[in-house]
Amino acid sequence: MFPSRKFDFVPIAAPNFALIVSGMSEPRSYLVCASQRSGSTLLVESLRATTVAGNPEEFFQYLPSTSRSPQPRQWFESVTDETVLSLLAPLEPGTADTRTAEQWRDQLLSVGRTPNGVWGGKLMWNQVPLVLDRAAGLPDRSGDDLRSALGDILDRDLAFIHVYRRDVVAQAVSMWRAVQTQVWRDDATPPAPHDGAEYHADGIAHLVRILRDQDVQWRNWFETEGLDHIDISFDDLVAAPQATAAKVLVELGLDADLAPPPPLKRQSDGRSKEWVERYRSEAAANGLPL
């Protein structure tokens, strides 16, 4: 008689027979590549709402030294103009992230994945150094460049989704208001007409340079690496958010019919439009970037 033994059973995901019968491939994990105020939050929240397209978050924004995303003044570290800096909240201390690189990766993968195995996340170009630093602590590295780092952290078969905004001035105005108010998410509440944010051409100009450079860097990276990617413009996303999300779902091998109505509302208002027009006029007169 065999001795009694306790067995630990590990659950294994069942094969998706619908995909097998239809000839479709398994759905792909993905990374949204963007810059701040480009509309990427609307896209990832739409994908999250499907419950099958990962739980995309901006996982790479948190600084290991503080466990916080960059604070308003950290966006302006090279700026010495006190009329700009005085409009931004002072730095607040944080708590150092003591997780190992492997612990950080494992948690990131667990949180970002839906039960069907699809992982989703979002990366801004200014966060690339954080990705490289985190990946440097992983064992058995495949290389030290960004593509290797993403492969070592995430997956070798990632789909890349590039979200961009043609009107960088409007994007910078949106970010300039956000760094002052520290309200980054759109919701059902209309923006307050007097939210405490103040117009400053040099503050906006600083962000125009940053945001324009971020998009240039993404485009250069895709070209240099020869990476196929999905291009999503802010204009298309805002004009037809549900249809745009459906397009992305198809590209990921998921059901387009799962695309939800837009879960967020735009924060832009008449005040932002006034600032955009004012900045364009002052930029033309004073040689500020457009």
What residue ranges belong to the model's regions?
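PAPS-dependent sulfotransferase catalytic core
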Residues: 2-115, 266-271, 275
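Aromatic-acidic/polar surface patches that form glycan- and anion
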Residues: 25, 35-36, 113, 127, ...
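Short coil/turn segments at beta-strand junctions that form active-site/ligand-binding loops
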Residues: 26-28, 115-117, 156-158, 227-228
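Hydrophobic/aromatic beta-strand patches that form the interior of the parallel beta-sheet core
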Residues: 30, 54, 119-121, 159-163, ...
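Surface-exposed, flexible loop/turn segments at secondary-structure boundaries
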Residues: 40, 61, 126, 168-169, ...
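The conserved 3'-phosphoadenosine-5'-phosphosulfate
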Residues: 63-71, 187-205, 219-290
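Short, conserved catalytic or adaptor-binding loops enriched in Gly and charged residues
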Residues: 110-112, 152-153, 220-225
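PAPS-dependent sulfotransferase catalytic domain
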Residues: 120-219, 242-257
